[in-house]
Amino acid sequence: FEASDCVSCGACSQACPTSAISDVFQSKAIEATKSTRTICTYCGVGCNLEVSTSNGEILSIQAPYDAEVNQGHTCIKGRYAFKFYNHQDRLDSPMIKRNGVFEKVSWDEVYDYLASKLGHFRDEFGPDSIAGISSARCTNEENYLMQKFIRTVIGTNNIDGCARVCHSPTALGMQRTFGTGAATNSIDDLNDTNCIMVIGANPTDAHPVTGAKLKQFAMKSDHVSIVIDPRRTELAKYANHHLALRPGTNVALLNMMMYYIITEGLIDSSFVASRTEGYDAFQNEILNIDLDALESVTGVNREDVKAAAIAYATAPNAMSFHGLGVTEHSQGTFTVIQIADLALLTGNIGRRGVGVNPL
């Protein structure tokens, strides 16, 4: 069992029709007095969860089969990591530090305290002496209210969030190429694609439910999988092409792929002519790259890059997925642009089973 690929996600216990496989939390669900549909907060997949509770305590979490995102599946954390909700060390009231010690206070008191302090700093040092930092774990509405509070109540533009670091390269790169910074396709489009390219992402660890779907795709013999990552990730074990480039050479490797797509005559000429701009200048730049230098920089054999490029370009439908290994880098925006350019060169945009998808 230890040597297997099992990650103890609990899907078998939920699916077993005879309860021969079960878990202690699932059996407790019969004691629940309330069931609530909610969304998992651990990663960005957005799995739906059915939470069974009694007297405010979580007894069991199951994955509903009618959920479009996860379709009855969830990871080990989504299903089992919930004891902290009712843990005795969890804060259940606001606290103010007095004489070096945190003391519990009422909500009315803490609101008065915050309003007084923020008002003092704003009046004494000016609005720009205050800054707000929001979070990707907040809802869209909460983030909107946070920036509205900082801008209109405090009177400053000093508002930031963690997504600026991890997602802004994707938003900017895709906006420059496609006009919008969102994923172009649904994860369900894996059912309609023939090839996936995963670059700078380890979804079986970071996005387990999506990663499981990608792994299922990669394990099928009639599908093509390309993994571009310095590490031998779980998906790399099943990939047809694993390009283990040196860290920081994403742009160089993608330039090599586009070079071979152009020189092998694999571009979608009609798509490029009708849907893109500036191709002639782009082609001239790509054809003038120094393959010897790029091969040396990336540490990847050019023939391996060529084979992966041909596999991507010749697939009837090809999807790409990229993660923080691409975006949290000084070349993040340029790499996203190159990934988008690959899709444009081969016409892999604008229909089911294709596209560029940030994780």
Show where each model-derived region lies.
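Extreme N-terminal leader/targeting regions
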Residues: 42-45, 50-51, 55-57, 67, ...
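Catalytic P-loop NTP-binding/switch module of NTPases
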Residues: 58-98
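Conserved phosphate/anionic-ligand binding catalytic regions in large, soluble enzymes, centered on
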Residues: 46, 70-78, 82, 331-335, ...
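Short Cys/His-rich metal-coordination motifs, predominantly Zn2+-binding knuckles/fingers
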Residues: 9, 43, 78
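Immediate flanking context of iron-sulfur cluster ligation sites
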Residues: 3-4, 31-38, 56-71
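A short glycine-leucine-enriched loop at secondary-structure breakpoints
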Residues: 9-11, 299
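Iron-sulfur cluster-binding cysteine motifs and their immediate structural context
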Residues: 1, 11-28, 46-57, 75
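Cofactor-pocket helix-loop regions in the catalytic cores of large enzyme subunits
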Residues: 3-4, 27-41, 95-359
